[in-house]
Amino acid sequence: MPGDLTEEERRIIAQKHFDHWFESASDFYITYEFDKNRGKLSKAAFELHQSVERFFACTLLSCTNYLPKSHNIEKLRKLCAQIDPEFTDIFPMENKFHRRSFRCLQRAYIDARYSEHYEITVEELDYLAGEVEKLKGLTEQVCQRRIGG
């Protein structure tokens, strides 16, 4: 039937998605570090948001060949958690600092670029970057498991 793919075709498509989105997410992370080190915290927050969004996109596309048209990283995280529950461990919401930091990251997609009132601290960025490092590792693990098997 049209639209039915063999397992090998699915694997090839998943690998292409992984190669594209994982590299893109990693590139945004490098740009985040550059901007943070220059003291451009709002721009760094936007770049970090893009890195997160793209790691989630990498997982969704590599594992399901589907990506909703959304920049809402909380929604994307929930979709990834349906693929692997370990995604719920990334960006925990167990205390006020974690919740505030994640909200700042979520808002960065719009506010970091367009609002003169957007603020994020180095401490918040450092915490979030640590979570993105975990996200990167989990993304690679989950996607490679899908591609390899």
Question: What does each of the following model-derived ranges do?
Answer:
Residues 1-149:
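Terminal alpha-helical segments
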